[in-house]
């Protein structure tokens, strides 16, 4: 009888260990905040395999995993009702999370989102061939670049969503080009793959007296517009992802007044007139 009871006790203990990852609560776990407004529950004690159990809920789906560390880092997985598989990878320093959704085979990506501690993120959606078809890059300040209809050659549509207005353009394998047109003038903001910004201006006006030209200073991120050999205004594309405009005096020799932040798309167009 004693051996029987010991056997039952051992079985119950093993079951408890196996179910440990499914029964984490505030008493036996610690909640750790993660980038992307998520959190993970980490068991206070190691399981039978000498690892810490992890549980996180993402879009109402419970993900489970284990880790050698008790700080919340590790890999968690789950399966949706449609049998697609979800994988959450938490970096060792907790500074980044990677959320991936795969097809039923567990290999073909459907979507992927990488979120950093500073709230910046990169989100990608994939087509049936496993190629990126849509992409959203969100900066720490909340402004973002949105790419849609991405083709296999890397081309597609582009949109930069700033604080209070939107710039639209195109994507190529080399760069993003965002365009604003006003009359004969076209302003192009180019963003390289590495994130470097350059701006250029083209004017099809045939009259030399009114035709606009511009020079870009990469050191100050300033586009200086000139008409009839006189500087008329500076457009500054700041690191804070804003654009300011400041006028030159009538002689075109020095700036006057203060730089004013552009808050509407029409204000950019007015600056191009």
Swiss-Prot record:
A lipid is attached at residue 17 (S-diacylglycerol cysteine). One of its GO terms (cellular component) is cell surface. Coiled coil: none annotated. Gene3D superfamilies: 3.90.930.1, C1 set domains (antibody constant domain-like). The keyword Membrane applies. Residues 1-16 form the signal peptide. This is Outer surface protein A.
């Amino acid at each position: 009888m004693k051996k029987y009871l010991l056997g039952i006790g051992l079985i119950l203990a093993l079951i408890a260990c196996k179910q440990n990852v499914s029964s984490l609560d505030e008493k036996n776990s610690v909640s750790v905040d993660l980038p992307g407004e998520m959190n993970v529950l980490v068991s206070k004690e190691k399981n039978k395999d000498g690892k810490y159990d992890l549980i996180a809920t993402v879009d109402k789906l419970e993900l489970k995993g284990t880790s050698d560390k008790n700080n919340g880092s590790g890999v968690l997985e789950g399966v949706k009702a449609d049998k697609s598989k979800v994988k959450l990878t938490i970096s060792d320093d907790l500074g980044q999370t990677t959320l991936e959704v795969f097809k039923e085979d567990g290999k073909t990506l459907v979507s992927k989102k990488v979120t950093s501690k500073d709230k910046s993120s990169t989100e990608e959606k994939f087509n049936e061939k496993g190629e990126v078809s849509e992409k959203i890059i969100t900066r720490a300040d909340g402004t973002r670049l949105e790419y849609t209809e991405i083709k296999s050659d890397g081309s597609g549509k582009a949109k930069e969503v700033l604080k209070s207005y939107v710039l639209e353009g195109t994507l190529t394998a080399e760069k993003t080009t965002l365009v604003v047109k006003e009359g004969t003038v076209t302003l192009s903001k180019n963003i390289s793959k590495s994130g470097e910004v350059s701006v250029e201006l083209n004017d099809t006006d045939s009259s030399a007296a009114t035709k606009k030209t511009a020079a870009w200073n990469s050191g100050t991120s300033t586009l200086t517009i000139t008409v009839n050999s006189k500087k008329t205004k500076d457009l500054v594309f700041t690191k804070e992802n804003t654009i300011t405009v400041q006028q030159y005096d009538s002689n075109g020799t020095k700036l006057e007044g203060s730089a004013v932040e552009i808050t509407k798309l029409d204000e950019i167009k007015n600056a191009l007139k």
